[in-house]
Amino acid sequence: MKVSYKKLWIMCAEREISKGELRKRAGVSSATFTKMRRNQEVALSVLLKIADVLECNAGDMMDFIKDEDYAHQNIDVDEVW
């Protein structure tokens, strides 16, 4: 299984929250944000900080995708944001 943060990026675009603003408000490092942009796993504590800022649940920001379906679900974050 792979993780996809597509829902997070869409949520931020809809709320007009920039990457920098979200990072600062959540207290997340740029290195961690880069991992998320690459759909790499991050600590649950990071997800909870972001969820707190966005007033949502961690599950609202991400999906788990089967390995064989992952290539079809991957998006370019810059297209959304």
Language-model-derived ranges and their functions:
Residues 1-18:
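A short, Lys/Arg-rich alpha-helix, primarily the initiator
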Residues 12, 23, 37, 51:
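The alpha-helix within a helix-turn-helix
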Residues 9, 20, 48, 59:
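Residues within the helices of the helix-turn-helix
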Residues 13, 27, 38, 66:
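Residue-level detection of the helix-turn-helix DNA-binding "recognition helix"
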